């Protein structure tokens, strides 16, 4: 992909890039009262023009009428405006009203047909396009959407991490799964990465911590929903912060250096990294030993006509390892994730053992 760095298409860029404004543009009065208090704190004002809801019957946006309100405000008080587009018609209207930045929503990213239509509508466009992660943690879909826009000649590209849907109980509206966007950034280092703490959190009190975590991970910017009266918002009321509090939130965030510069710190860092490398080696050696033992168990089960999956054994492992984790002051959820991965690999390994033996038997019968 051909990707321009954020500083090359947003000349005023100073980390972090801030995109903020109401979830939905509800009325002209609400837009003004939500936006005016934050204009000196943001790079782009965001606002939902169309708001497709999970189920019909709720407020779904004002459409072109809301863009007219935005245009009226921009004539009086210049600012850059960002909005979501989901159809070629949305793109056409965005161009008509001189919108400054577009983003692609999670529900759109998940559908390659929709993305292809939008990419065609934006063929060769210079307007920046940010692509939100798909609803579920499918990195290939996220990359595929970005690649479609890149092939259409859109060079001012970026990605928005808004978290992922999960059926697991969580304090978040969408679980962060930080490693997924970091994998994307690792593959495309120039790609601007923006965090949407509002959609990850689902609750205003969680927004600052998520925003700080994103900056700790060297994200390029933040998209935060702000409303003049969040408790009266027509959509996503629980996750929008009061507009007058945006400045306090931003002032409370700590910016980290992108790299170490002092020699004494670098020297100490290298010592710690060597210890981490050694610890990782020991972990991998332990996993290798475990897989060898799993293979032996697979052979023993096959020879004695015993099923691969033993529920009682799995429950025993699941419970005892959590107790061990607690004794070692390790996060239980983290340990459970590791256990599930190890168990999946163990089942796969034993299945391969069963299949290998059957193949040998078939060969000998030939």
Give the ranges of each region predicted by the language model.
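Glycine-rich, proline-tolerant flexible connector loops at the mouths of alpha/beta enzymes
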Residues: 46-65, 228-237, 297-308
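Hydrophobic faces of well-ordered beta-strands that scaffold small-molecule active sites
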Residues: 16-22, 43-47, 81-83, 102-104, ...
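Active-site mouth loops of central-metabolism enzymes
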Residues: 16-33, 56-59, 80-85, 105-106, ...
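Domain-level signature for soluble enzymes in the chorismate/prephenate branch of the shikimate pathway
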Residues: 258-366
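Catalytic beta/alpha-barrel core
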Residues: 60, 79-87, 91, 100-115, ...
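Catalytic domains of carbohydrate-active enzymes, especially glycoside hydrolases
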Residues: 33-49, 97
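N-terminal amphipathic alpha-helix/helix-capping segment at the start of soluble metabolic enzymes
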Residues: 1-20, 251, 261
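Catalytic alpha/beta core domains of metabolic enzymes, predominantly
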Residues: 114-245, 252, 257-264
């Amino acid at each position: 992909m051909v990707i321009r760095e954020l500083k090359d298409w947003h000349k005023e860029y100073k980390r972090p890039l801030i995109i903020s404004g109401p979830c939905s543009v509800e009325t002209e009065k609400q837009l003004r009262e939500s936006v005016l208090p934050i204009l000196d704190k943001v790079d782009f004002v965001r606002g939902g023009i169309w708001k497709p809801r999970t189920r019909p019957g709720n407020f779904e946006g004002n459409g072109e009428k809301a863009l007219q309100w935005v245009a009226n405000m921009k004539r009086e008080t210049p600012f850059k405006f960002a909005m979501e587009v989901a159809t070629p018609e949305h793109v056409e209207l965005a161009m008509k009203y001189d919108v400054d930045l577009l983003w692609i929503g999670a529900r759109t990213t998940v559908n390659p047909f929709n993305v292809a239509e939008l990419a065609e509508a934006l063929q060769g466009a210079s307007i920046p396009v940010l692509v939100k992660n798909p609803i579920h943690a499918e990195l290939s879909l996220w990359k595929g959407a970005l690649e479609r826009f890149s092939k259409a000649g859109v060079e001012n590209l970026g990605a928005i991490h808004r978290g992922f849907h999960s059926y697991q109980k969580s304090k978040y509206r969408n679980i962060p799964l930080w490693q997924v966007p970091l994998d994307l950034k690792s593959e495309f280092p120039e790609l601007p990465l923006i965090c949407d703490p509002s959609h990850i959190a689902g609750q205003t009190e969680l927004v600052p911590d998520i925003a700080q975590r994103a900056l700790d991970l060297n994200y390029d910017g933040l998209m935060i929903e702000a409303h003049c009266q969040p408790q009266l918002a027509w959509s996503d009321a629980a996750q929008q912060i009061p507009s007058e509090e945006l400045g306090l939130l931003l002032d409370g965030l700590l910016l980290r250096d992108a790299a170490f510069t002092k020699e004494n710190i670098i020297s100490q860092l290298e010592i710690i990294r060597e210890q981490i490398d050694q610890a990782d080696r020991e972990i991998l050696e332990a996993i290798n030993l475990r897989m060898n033992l799993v293979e032996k168990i697979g052979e023993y089960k096959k020879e004695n006509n015993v099923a691969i999956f033993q529920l009682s054994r799995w429950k025993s492992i699941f419970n005892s390892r959590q107790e061990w984790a607690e004794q070692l002051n390790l996060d239980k959820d983290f340990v459970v994730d590791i256990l599930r991965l190890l168990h999946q690999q163990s089942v796969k390994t034993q299945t391969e053992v069963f299949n290998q033996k059957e193949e040998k038997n078939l060969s000998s019968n030939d």
